């Protein structure tokens, strides 16, 4: 019987996460005119409930070991929760104001920032080629952001970009937590609860009543978010970022397809050039890292 390698499992899970997060964006946009903080709260609430049910089941089967937080993990749980919240809020704000594909590609700057934060947190080396790829990918993102003196016009794309920064830090934190053997469901519960708490002040002062349809759309978004979170946590548990991060870009394909089918969205020329630059740099970095590792193993 053929044994599936951890890298193959990581690739499978990262593509699953890309699909779920692209579909989540569709449901968030279909929910209509609701403040992005309120949307984020419901997204996290559903993910929290699903993760909590799984944790209670683990607790019943494995006892207190299922909920124990390893020594040294608390700092990185907070870091993952804060960074993930920045990622969610930035992404949700962007989804409401720009093309799904634009929001997705700027959010997919995350793998480049994962490399940077893995260097800072895990002391994984950044070699010259990946560093050049990061710089050129950043220049590609500028074509999508389209800097101007009109802050209102730029804000959604900047929010999407900062969402990518936050997601990159969150992924690096997940990798560190995997080394510390922290339960993946605990990571999701901690993040979801933290992000929900950040939303509470807004909900107390400015809650918008929702229709049954809007509630249903946000519940679907939350279910997709939970699927995405479980998948990305599993992916970085099974394999390091430098082996699987390239496959995260499959979300661009899903988002472009969903944006066209559901909202008749077509990216402009500058954005398309930006997509090509960022994805090309991701492919170059992946091939370089893969060849470097194979050369090391064959020595």
Task: Go through the PLM ranges and name each one.
Residues 9-17, 61-90, 155-163, 203, ...:
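Loop-to-transmembrane-helix transition segments
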Residues 18-22, 52, 81-89, 111-116, ...:
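Hydrophobic/small/kink-forming positions within alpha-helical transmembrane segments
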Residues 26-29, 34-36, 51, 149-210, ...:
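Transmembrane alpha-helical segments that form core, pore/gating elements
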Residues 31, 39, 94-95, 100, ...:
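Hydrophobic/aromatic residues within transmembrane alpha-helices
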Residues 35-86, 166-170, 189-205:
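Transmembrane alpha-helices of multi-pass small-molecule transport proteins
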Residues 103-109, 177, 181-193, 229-260:
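Helix-helix packing/entry segments at the starts of transmembrane helices
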Residues 110-135, 253-272:
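C-terminal transmembrane-helix exit sites in multi-pass transporters
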Residues 129-146, 270-289:
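Hydrophobic transmembrane alpha-helices of multi-pass small-molecule transport proteins
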């Amino acid at each position: 019987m053929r044994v599936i390698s951890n890298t193959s499992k990581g690739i499978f899970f990262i593509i699953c996460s890309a699909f779920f997060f692209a579909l989540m964006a569709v449901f968030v946009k279909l929910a209509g005119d609701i403040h992005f903080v309120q949307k984020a709260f419901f997204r996290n609430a559903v993910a929290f409930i699903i993760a909590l049910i799984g944790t209670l089941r683990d607790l019943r089967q494995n006892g207190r070991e299922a909920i124990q937080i390893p020594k040294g993990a608390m700092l990185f749980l907070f870091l993952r929760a804060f960074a993930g919240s920045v990622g969610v809020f930035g992404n949700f704000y962007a989804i409401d104001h720009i093309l799904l594909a634009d929001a997705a590609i700027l959010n997919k700057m995350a793998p480049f920032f994962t490399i940077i934060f893995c260097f800072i947190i895990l002391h994984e080396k950044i070699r010259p080629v990946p560093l050049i790829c990061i710089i050129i990918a950043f220049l590609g993102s500028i074509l999508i952001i389209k800097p101007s003196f009109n802050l209102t016009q730029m804000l959604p794309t900047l929010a999407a970009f900062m969402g990518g920064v936050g997601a990159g830090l969150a992924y690096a934190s997940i990798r560190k937590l995997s080394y510390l053997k922290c339960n993946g469901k605990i990571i999701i519960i901690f993040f979801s609860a933290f992000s929900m708490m950040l939303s509470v002040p807004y909900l107390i002062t400015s809650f918008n009543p929702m229709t049954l349809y809007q509630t249903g759309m946000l519940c679907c978004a939350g279910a997709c978010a939970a699927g995405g979170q479980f998948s990305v946590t599993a992916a970085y548990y099974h394999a390091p970022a430098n082996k699987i991060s390239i496959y995260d870009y499959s979300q661009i394909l899903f988002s472009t397809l969903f944006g066209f089918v559901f909202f008749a969205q077509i990216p402009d020329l500058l954005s398309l050039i930006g997509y090509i630059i960022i994805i090309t740099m991701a492919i170059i970095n992946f091939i370089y890292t893969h060849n470097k590792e194979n050369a090391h193993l064959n020595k």
